[in-house]
């Protein structure tokens, strides 16, 4: 996902959200710079007390007479190179926006949105092994500990396989999550490191994973959006 970012948005991502079987929610790592046609809205979506900026943009993929807008929630975490900025694209406007602080000193922040009782997060674990992957899942779980009505999904580049990620989690958390992997590998070396984790933070009821088809960005356009 390191091609020219403007073309990445205008070709790959546009195709994923407007083509056949368009995606409702798309998690974008290495989001680079947003397309010039994405307009920042005046809505204040910044969570109180978290100093990591996030903004809402409206991106019209149709025309002025026949608009077809999606919303982009964009956090410029990479102020220097602009390469590893984070984004979530949604066909529906978010009811709430989340920015969870980096779970370890070296980690990136965790950004997310809530639509109804469903929360979606875009994450990018540390390179060379994704050692903070377990901390990322635990941080999301802890955030919703007193909100058992919320189902959450963490999507992105975990930089480690699902099996090795599960090994980082405590047994209680393992019983409340489900891994949703794309049908083919997502890294040129043949590993699957881009996938989703669904879960619920209720510790009193049995977790029943949602029936999710290929919601992952990497499943639809692996050649464009797979990891290096």
What do the PLM-derived regions correspond to, one by one?
Residues 1-16, 25, 80-228:
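Active-site regions of metal-assisted phosphoester/phosphodiester hydrolases
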Residues 1-68, 83:
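N-terminal, active-site-proximal structural segment of metallo-dependent hydrolase catalytic domains
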Residues 30, 75-76, 156:
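Short glycine-centered, acidic/aromatic-flanked micro-motifs in structured strand/loop junctions
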Residues 66-79:
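Conserved catalytic-core segment of clan PA serine endopeptidases
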